[in-house]
Amino acid sequence: MKNFIFNHPLISDKLSKMRDVNTGYNFFKQLLTEITTLMMYEVGKGYELEEISVTTPLATTKAHKLKHNFVIVPILRAGLGMVDGVHNVIPTARVGHIGLYRDEKTFQPVEYYSKFPQTMDDGHVIVLDPMLATGASVIKAISLVKNIQPKKPRSIKFMGLLGAPEGLKALNQAHPDVDVYLACLDEKLNDKNYIYPGLGDAGDRIFGTK
């Protein structure tokens, strides 16, 4: 298990704009895409390469490419806002989807939709959700990824924008084998389980809804 909290001036600058209540949804989504792309530099470390032969205009030479398939799994709906940022770096990554809603009696996430590429059991998976609040939805989503195929993915990583210490701790305890990458770890959860100071409802701000 690895927790990586980014400390980068470009990410910090863009994140401050996302937090601003006056930032419109188009710019908000653009900033989320840009931060996701920047984060992929670190998320992509450690993936295996294989040697290939490439013909340049001058010669044939040895080169390297990513060895295994990649699948990104956004948690609906806010996770969709991070897909383009990953595709900017790994355009061949296939996309699975997980839809969850909260049971009003148990307050636990319940699956209402999931669909995954057949390459899940032969590649690396990155689960996407901008907000890691209580951690319940992310924990549920990762459990679904682990159980959907008889053969597990080679690796599973989680990538988010903001996290609360409570959610990070819960995720680490539930899935100690999953590396976690966050652009920022905020102060706490408030009494409504929103990340504080946060940036509001990420899904609403991405899609311009209320």
Swiss-Prot record:
One of its GO terms (molecular function) is uracil phosphoribosyltransferase activity. One of its GO terms (biological process) is UMP salvage. The keyword Translocase does not apply. It is an enzyme of class 2 (transferase). Binds 1 Mg(2+) ion per subunit. The magnesium is bound as Mg-PRPP. It comes from the Bacteria. It catalyses: UMP + diphosphate = 5-phospho-alpha-D-ribose 1-diphosphate + uracil. 5-phospho-alpha-D-ribose 1-diphosphate binds at residues 77, 102, 129-137, 201. Keywords: Allosteric enzyme, Glycosyltransferase, GTP-binding, Magnesium, Nucleotide-binding, Transferase. Allosterically activated by GTP. CDD domains: PRTases_typeI (cd06223). Its cofactor is Mg(2+). Its EC number is 2.4.2.9. InterPro entries: PRibTrfase_dom (IPR000836), PRTase-like (IPR029057), Upp_B (IPR034332), UPRTase/APRTase (IPR050054), Ura_phspho_trans (IPR005765). Uracil binds at residues 195, 200-202. Pfam families: UPRTase. Pathway: Pyrimidine metabolism; UMP biosynthesis via salvage pathway; UMP from uracil: step 1/1. NCBIfam families: PRK00129.1, upp. Catalyzes the conversion of uracil and 5-phospho-alpha-D-ribose 1-diphosphate (PRPP) to UMP and diphosphate. Belongs to the UPRTase family. This is Uracil phosphoribosyltransferase.
